[in-house]
């Protein structure tokens, strides 16, 4: 991928993927009401999501990521943007955005007899699942747990642990600054952002 126009083109395609994620998420959320004890509904930063996706695509192409991996990362972009949008909008992360891509990854790993993806997803997910269980979905929702599993499968165990530890610290810091430590907050944006950052800058 040495042609000068490749990276800008990939950036545009990733922006389109993000736009698709927004539209799909908006359609799924249209008839969904936020839970009373969940995060308050808000307005997702659509323009920033699309612009961020374009930057990620541009950066990945510039770093020489192979076309098949670029395609997979583009599909993941749809999922991450949709998860971010829905959690901010209605406080829920739909299974459509997490379990479908996770299932495809796990199925592929089983077919190839490469169980690293499955093991990474399980190991990384366990502490978040425990948190969701004990908080009864208030501090950590099950949609967040499934997004963590997807991140573990995509990034691998070590990178996912680092990324999600950073996401938790940033979420706590932001909640403290905003004086919302006792209120449920949309956590998917922090998780999705951590996955995107780790994927883009390869903390592997």
Residue ranges, per PLM feature:
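A membrane-topology feature that recognizes alpha-helical transmembrane segments
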Residues: 1-204
């Amino acid at each position: 991928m040495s042609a000068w126009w490749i990276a800008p083109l990939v950036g545009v395609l990733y922006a389109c993927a993000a736009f698709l994620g927004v539209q799909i998420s908006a359609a799924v959320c249209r008839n969904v009401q936020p839970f009373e004890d969940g995060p308050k509904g808000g307005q997702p930063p659509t323009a920033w999501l699309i612009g961020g996706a374009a930057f990620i695509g541009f950066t990945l192409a510039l770093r020489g990521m192979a076309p098949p991996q670029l395609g997979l990362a583009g599909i993941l972009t749809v999922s991450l943007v949709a998860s971010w949008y829905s959690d901010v909008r209605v406080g829920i992360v739909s299974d459509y955005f997490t379990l479908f891509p996770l299932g495809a990854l796990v199925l592929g790993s089983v077919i190839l007899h490469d169980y690293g993806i499955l093991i990474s997803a399980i190991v990384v997910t366990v502490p978040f699942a425990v948190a969701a269980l004990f908080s009864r979905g208030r501090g950590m929702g099950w949609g967040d747990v499934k997004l963590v599993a997807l991140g573990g499968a995509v990034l691998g165990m070590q990178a996912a642990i680092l990324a999600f530890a950073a996401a938790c610290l940033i979420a706590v810091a932001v909640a403290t600054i905003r004086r919302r430590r006792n209120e449920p907050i949309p956590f998917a944006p922090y998780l999705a952002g951590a996955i995107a950052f780790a994927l883009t800058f390869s903390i592997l």
